[in-house]
Amino acid sequence: MLSTTRLLALSTLLTPILAHIALWDPAMYGWTDDPNQWDPVVPLMHLPFDQWWFHGYMNVPPAEGKFMTLPSGGTYNGQVACNKALTKYGQNPAQQTGIYACDGPTDQGGIGAMHTSDKWNSPDPVDLKGCAIAIAYESDPTKIKPEDFTVISVNHKCVWFKDIDFQIPSDLPPCPPGGCHCLWEWIHADDAGSEQLFHLAYRCTVEGATGTRPLPSHSQQMSC
């Protein structure tokens, strides 16, 4: 039987892992070398603009030369998880074997972090609101405004599985020198916990881009 001290230590270690979800990529603003990093999964609802914009990491850019690479006409293969340790960027392979975006110590797994009314291990979850990648053709993050971003790819089965694909359009124009900036956005409904906003920024580039037309003007998302 575990001692009280060991139980308390275990609960402390699990607390961040039972938080929420992020799309993990080394080109993320706020990325650190900590293989157990969890702070990018903290939700942002009701925070002032300067605290939620770029997740508050405007002054913590990715390392020089790091880009989220979006293959023109191809697929961006990413990983969403409630802790970096569960992804390929962790240091313990035994923690990376799960197929879901979060793990947990009970028979409910990591369902709480996914904010869905679907049952754990459901083969065909239906209460998922999807997440998206948006792009802005500006290399200087201080010049970017929310309205500069255009959504270019949506995954409607997000978040559920850890491995996630985003189909990238084939007609995107090349990024400017210094690259583009991308966002990962997820707003889950309030039917499984309070409504929350998840928002992370990345330095990105479009590999093999040959498009010549600028992206269409953005419009406010609507239910359909």
Where are the regions that the model predicts?
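Peripheral, solvent-exposed domain-edge segments
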Residues: 2-6, 15-167, 177, 192-224
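Membrane-associated scaffolding surfaces of BAR-superfamily helical dimers
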Residues: 11
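Extracellular beta-strand-rich recognition modules
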Residues: 78-80, 182-186
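Flexible gly/pro/ser-rich segments immediately N-terminal to CXXCH heme-c attachment motifs
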Residues: 171
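Short glycine/proline/serine/threonine-rich loop/turn segments at secondary-structure transition edges
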Residues: 174-180
